[in-house]
Amino acid sequence: MSQEAILEKVRSIVAEQLSVEASEIKPDSNFQNDLGADSLDTVELVMALEEAFDIEIPDEAAEGITTVGDAVKYIEDKQS
């Protein structure tokens, strides 16, 4: 899956999970500061990404995923 395809899928999941417009979601958007996620939203978002991409994101890794771009890079690395 290309980086662009991953970004689009992540953007769609984030939009649905956080009830924000997909057009507002940029690679450098911070889940909490820019998109209004709280800690529970972040946990649910990680779970949704794990399910959508059929990967496991350990807690230590999840703590380092704070932006849309971080999520895309992590998923891209897991799939290669």
UniProtKB/Swiss-Prot annotation:
This is Acyl carrier protein. GO terms for molecular function: acyl binding; acyl carrier activity; phosphopantetheine binding. Keywords: Cytoplasm, Fatty acid biosynthesis, Fatty acid metabolism, Lipid biosynthesis, Lipid metabolism, Phosphopantetheine, Phosphoprotein. The gene is acpP. Carrier of the growing fatty acid chain in fatty acid biosynthesis. The lineage of its organism: Bacteria, Bacillati, Cyanobacteriota, Cyanophyceae, Synechococcales. Pathway: Lipid metabolism; fatty acid biosynthesis. InterPro entries: ACP, ACP-like_sf, PKS_PP-bd, PP-bd_ACP, Ppantetheine_attach_site. GO terms for cellular component: cytosol; membrane. Residues 4-79 form the Carrier domain. 4'-phosphopantetheine is transferred from CoA to a specific serine of apo-ACP by AcpS. This modification is essential for activity because fatty acids are bound in thioester linkage to the sulfhydryl of the prosthetic group. Transmembrane segments: none annotated. Belongs to the acyl carrier protein (ACP) family. It is found in: Cytoplasm. Its main location: cytoplasm. PANTHER family: ACYL CARRIER PROTEIN (PTHR20863), CARRIER DOMAIN-CONTAINING PROTEIN (PTHR20863:SF76). The modification O-(pantetheine 4'-phosphoryl)serine is found at residue 39. One of its GO terms (biological process) is lipid A biosynthetic process.
